[in-house]
Amino acid sequence: MTRDEFDAYCKSLTATTNVVQWGGSSVWKVGGKIFTICSHWGPVDRDCISFKCTDHSYQVLCELPGVVPAPYLARAKWVQVQSNETLTDDDIKSYIEEAHAIIAAKLTKKQQRDLGLLPA
């Protein structure tokens, strides 16, 4: 998945915002909280996608070649996809959507309603 495809997909999710920070990283948020990042963090010389995941997904994904605990964020169960061969674009989109849902669920009910994540 290219950075442009990553950004386009993240933009399509409900109530997302984007900021470019930390040396040019594309940081996507819901309710002001980060759920995914496309960056050059780590040893690979290309954009890598990092995202929040469930405990189970974290364990499974970290066993795959080309997926590592995300630099600076691993303790919060984030992974970084460093290889285009490990996961399909659809797989990555599914994990990004799950990351969005995980972070959105941590917002207050009022925030969720205000952002259109829950019925009014």
Predicted regions and their residues:
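Charge-dense, helix-prone N-terminal extensions
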Residues: 1-120
